[in-house]
Each structure stands twice: as C-alpha cells, then as structure tokens.
Amino acid sequence: DQIDRVVSMLRDIHPGAVFLLTTPPECHRRVRRKGKKKYYYTYVTNTKVEKVAETIRRYAVGKGLACWDLFSISGGRGSAKSWVKYQLSARDRIHFNIKGYELQGNLLYDAIIKGYNDYVGK
C-alpha cells in the first residue's frame, strides 16, 4: 500500500510527527472524442478520485490518523462542475485556481479551529 509506505517512511525519519491526511476533491479528466470532421476534447468526471478518497479515509481510520475529507467537504460526487461554474477551478479542471485554494485553506483552518475548540471544551 503506497500510503502506508509513505507514512512509515515519514515516521522513521520523524518518529514524533503527527499526521493529517487529506482526501482529494473531485476533478475532471480531459478526453479526446471524434467529431464529424475532426477530434475534439471534452471533460468528464474522474471517477477514480472517489475511490482514492475512500481508500485514504479507510486507511486513516484503520491507523488512527486524522483525516480531513476534502472530497466530501467540497461537495462529493458531481461537485467538480460547481467548482468550475463558480470559477474556483484552474483551466485544467484538476487543480484549484487562487480563489479555490484560498477557499480550501479557509475550510481547513475552520476545521482545525473547530476541532481544537471541541477538544478544549471537553
């Protein structure tokens, strides 16, 4: 398992490190299609991302690691279209643009602060 190899390697180098795994957001992939006279490109949902997100979530639970589920937080299945619609995706439809990364950072910050406040409030 690639995730386990990376986490194990990092633990060997930094035994006291604390890990926060994150899942990827849904994204598109570019596909080539044949038109009447020539080929053209279009974008379709990359269905493998949901499987990757589920694998990361399961791994984190199994190993007792924290996991921030960006896949679900960003809207889950079908959400990539919204990120494009609201101009939060880069032109490649895989990565966010500056506004998208700022939103991602704010969402992560809010989650960390909420977790901390829940922890100290116990």
Predicted regions and their residues:
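Generic structural signal for well-ordered alpha-helices
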Residues: 3-8, 53, 57
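Loop/turn elements at helix/coil->beta-strand transitions in domains of secreted/extracellular proteins
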Residues: 14-19, 62-66
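Secondary-structure transition/capping motifs at alpha-helix termini
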Residues: 10-13, 17, 115-118
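Catalytic His-Asp segment of secreted/periplasmic serine-dependent ester chemistry enzymes
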Residues: 27-122
